[in-house]
């Protein structure tokens, strides 16, 4: 198998950096090499330096493969959080995730998927819409890739796996081959970190002990396991985070990107206020400000209470009823438009409305449940 450029970056240091450390000691251990990276990010205000893309890739490689010590890893994560990762550092981290993490490929002729990047530590304040949005898009033939894990620090919020399970669709416990086969046949893939990326899962305890989101949390918003052409939709909270995301993903070669100031940093669009997002094509961001009021979708965002209530409301929404139907119509309609399934925004909202009224989204859920019952 021919190695990809990302694999080369993740596995090799830049020539200059390699020469500088090897000349000092030809047999440096992983811990000794990691000291050089830690020394850069962990210095004082005047002397702290950003890592190069290659250095950042190697630093995360050493972390994921446990060649750095626990003390070094903890120090690096908190120092990097305080200083904030630079775009090229995030790109280097992406290189390593691409090299060491799971890989998902579309079938020949399959439509490009929409890959949603949301905080892995879940939601605690607002009712998630994205599982239902995914079902509406799937019912129109639009493939979807989601990623997440079990409950984790710092929020310990509700996860994608739990939400789908409450609807009767179990998406954990699958091998990557099974996930890819299901994706190619049904259009949906959930990359579940405990099953598919154990190296990254091993770092969860550091989040708990640090008590803050490390830079890995920013990385999770930018990474997708999908290889090939796709539309990447990434959530953000603060404008500086969005700017770093644009630059990092441009360096990483992402061609089609949407950044969303969504609910709790997710890709869910609020209906209580204007939706701020950017559509980045060929490296040029176009700011979009979308008003739910213009499409008859303005209302209060639905609060999160518990999984039982959410499941009931979610099934109602798939049948075009209940409090989640309005935010679902808004979210699904917007993403139908942005993914190219609709000619304009109004047409997208109309398509979403038609899917809900016809029961197409609920039928898609039923088909996925049948598929899962026949796997494994």
Regions found by a protein language model. Give the residues of each.
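Phosphate/diphosphate-binding glycine-rich loops and adjacent basic-rich segments that engage nucleotide
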Residues: 174-236
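Glycine-rich ThDP/TPP pyrophosphate-binding loop and its adjacent helix/strand module
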Residues: 205, 228-269, 273-274
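Residue-level signal for inorganic ion chemistry
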Residues: 76, 164, 220, 332, ...
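Short glycine/threonine-rich catalytic loop with a Thr-x-Gly-x-Asp
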Residues: 294-307, 321-329
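Structural motif
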Residues: 112-115, 142-145, 162, 187-194, ...
